[in-house]
């Protein structure tokens, strides 16, 4: 029904404490995607599947910023990520997370990062999931395999951009 399973993990030393650290932080993000259109209506934007339980679509920025050394710089719909057709699919989301700790790591396990969710019944495919790091204004692919990232080293000031499929 939606763009695919997305699991994004950012972790590293939590600033504070007598030795400069107060343990380890872990920010688990699960950027939701849009649903496909039906024969009679547009799809829904940024939806979690019902069998996944009572999750928010994404964590509130205020909670993430209180618990982890990050700043949410952007959160909104990923414009035009939905599949076109007589009725359009729902849009995915875009979320930019700036790392405020001296170091951190990024891991991603996601589907539909190469082959986007396909359209059916005359509808067109939505955009594929995309996960990149922005460092000093340059976009970095954190892995040669899109959607599969293991322990990519993040630096203070890096922005992790998550763009879910429509």
Whereabouts are the PLM-identified features?
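Glycine/proline-enriched, intrinsically flexible loops and inter-domain linkers
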Residues: 1-166
